[in-house]
Amino acid sequence: MQRFLLTLLWLALWCNAQSQVSFGKAERFNDDWLFHLGDEPKASQPKFDDAQWRHLDVPHDWSIEGQLSKDLASCTGYLPAGIGWYRKHFVLSAQDIASLPLSYIYFEGIYNRSEVYLNGHLLGKRPNGYVSFLYDMTPYLRKGDNVLAVRVDHSRIADSRWYTGSGIYRDVWLVRAPKVHLAQWGTTYRLKQMNEDGSADIEVDVAVDFSAAGKKSTKKQAAMMLNVTLRDAEGRKVAAKACEARELQTLTLHVPDAKRWDLKHPYLYKLTVELSAGNTIDTIDSIETIHSIDQATINVGLRTLQFDPDHGFALNGKWMKVKGVCLHHDAGVLGAAVPREVWVRRVKELKRMGANAIRMSHNPQAPVLYDLCDSLGMLVMDEGSDEWEFPKRKWVEGWNQGTPAYDGSYDFFEEWIDRDVADMVRRDRNHPCIFLWSVGNEVDYPNDPYSHPVLDGGNAAINQPMFGGYKPDAPHAERIGKIAKRIAAVIRSIDTSRPVTGALAGVVMSNETEYPEAIDVVGYNYTENRYDIDHEKYPRRIIYGSETGVGYDAWKAVRDKEHIFGQFVWTGTDYLGESGRWPSRGLNTGLLDFGNFKKPRGWFRAALWSEEPVTYIGANPITSPRNNNRGDGRRRGNFVSAEAQDDWNLPVFPNRQGQASADSVIMRVVCYTNAPQARLLLNGSLVGEMKPQNDTIGIIHWDIPYAPGTLRAEGCDLQGNVLSAYEIKTHGEATALRLTELLPEDCEEVHQILVEVVDKDGNRVKSSQADIACDITGPAVLLGLEGSNNTDMSDYRDNHQPAYRGRLVAYVRRTGTGPVSVRFSAADIQAASMAF
């Protein structure tokens, strides 16, 4: 019975760590690190005096803790970087080492150019800040005290076109294992076929690492078995097989009544591989008789992918449109160290909007994000890099402003690209959400750095700036095709179950190279005008919008063309870096803002994408007759906006004549809806007649005189029945704060608290910029207050923050057991508290 309990405990550990580590006993190694910002040449040595270093837990991003400055680079969000050291003291007893003699350290991500030492010995270097990697600590491990030291060199501050963060910004794992164990990332599966009777056959590859067994490895192989078991979502065994353990074994499992993974019902099986000794195949069903040596558990999703140049993309045999968004890896005030709970809320908000895919822009991201996409039903385009052998421009004085810098990752490309790409594919290949591997983003951007004579051809049909014509001194674009072939070959050597793609910025230039032919599916960035031209010119090419704007026309180019299977909108959320001139935290192109609140453009996108009824209204002043005539016959606001905020208070027109009176203001009310028609009511009375959907611009609008009260839009079917509605109200003066915990059911450690400034009737005061302070008692810490204002350059780590549009979100991490009270206050407003 004791052995049975131990086996269950082992399984529980694996369920927690399965997507990060695929062997041994893994435990998070995040607590009790020491940190020093600055270089210390002797900090790798175990006896180095670190008594004055800062105590912290990882994940940790030191850049987000720094002071924003207009003297720093705009591309990385006007935030500092530098060199930092981490040290961790830990103890392993003789019993620990005897029971599991091998010890490894696994980092999910360190930005960047890391060096890892154990007891003064270099374990390895990894320059890429986005890949996950494992080091064997066994040769240098000591009984008793040990010191792990990590040097992080982010001294090249402007080394990216967006904010990267600095430090050990993802989870760390300590892995202890027997001398013979399952190989890291060595258990994988692939769907062999779906059968007509509803069953499925899957092939499972299992790699075993015998390297530490030395000369005894052959004998040990003969004495060991692999037991492979597939269980359904309810834990019932549906397939099992056993075989002798070898360095690599392939088994086929037959799955009756196979349930498919899809976007609405992302069904996941669990595959458990157990390496055991002293048993036979006949004892597989008797867990108490198995002497388990190692075990791994992975999620399994059964789905088919089909791509066609004329029909687009089919998931499980059903042709569909990919409604994707591009995502960078930060979360505003939290920087790059993003808690799981924040990712959960972000992905759920995007899915609620109608998005069904995420492009990992432009690098492998945190493993937890792929897990969420598996469980929530989101397709993923996994991307390797943004830069190859030569640097791209990095704007330091504002996006596309001034003189660029040229730091980057190019200097380690040649040495590391094969391994970096291979590690991305090996780490992520078991995720059913992944349907595309990308070799890179915009590596063919004209003259940044590659050039080609075709750029002298006048209208090259490239929508982005070319910075002049052909530059003979620049690297020739023919190199792109050769490198793409190399990277694609690495991917295909590991996984052939998904196609290889790339995101092309200069399609016309790349068409003169081998690049499009080196990949299976060709992504077009902002080049919708080439969809039909190239479909006719290259009839075997599979085309989609790998990066597009949020405009209606870009979506119609996908919706109305069968051969274009989807788009990835830039971007799903606002992100730090790639900033404009100061003040600008980042690029606010998101459908969601920094705090993961849906923006007007997000509502517009929901009206285009969602299968659920959607209606939204926003308003802009067209004119005040006294002071807003431009003198040329046009009136301010005489356009239809996809960015209209949901405000219904008297607009302010600052000018020498003062504010216009309510009866002199004409408001343009815009409605985003997926209903066939909509009408507008003010205080219960019809003020906007029923209007049909406008397929030219995708927006319905009315011009009405402003009057306070409740404005309501109703999206209706053709019979006039209300399908969905949206109301906005005139708010009064701020009187109180209102608190709401967001997604409490998904909270493990980090609580997300919505703080709203409200009037006496509970309406959010959207004009409020009240400075809100947060004070905590009990075992918890404030990670940050996110107001989502892109021009607010105040300290990210203060305990107070101005509200933006009358709200902010607070991130509070529990650090221990016991009651926690979080109090929010602002001048002349009633405070509020929340306990948990």
Identify the meaning behind each predicted range:
Residues E27-F29, L37-D39, T76, A81-W185, ...:
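Accessory beta-strand-rich segments of carbohydrate-active enzymes
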Residues V152, L275, G715, V757, ...:
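Conserved structural position at the C-terminal beta-strand
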Residues K25-Q45, D57-V58, P432-S438, D444-G523, ...:
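Substrate-binding clefts and catalytic carboxylate motifs of secreted carbohydrate-active enzymes
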Residues V21-E40, Q52-S93, E108, D145-G214, ...:
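Non-catalytic, glycine-rich low-complexity segments
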Residues L141-D145, D205-D308, H701-G709, D717, ...:
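Extended acidic/polar, glycine-enriched regions
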Residues H60-L92, A98-N119, G124-P127, K179-T188, ...:
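Active-site-adjacent substrate/metal-binding segments within catalytic domains
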Residues P46-D49, K219-N227, K264-K270, I666-R668, ...:
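Short flexible loop/turn segments that cap and initiate beta-strands
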Residues V131-F133, R246-V255, Q693-I700, D792-V809:
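Aromatic sugar-binding surface patches on proteins
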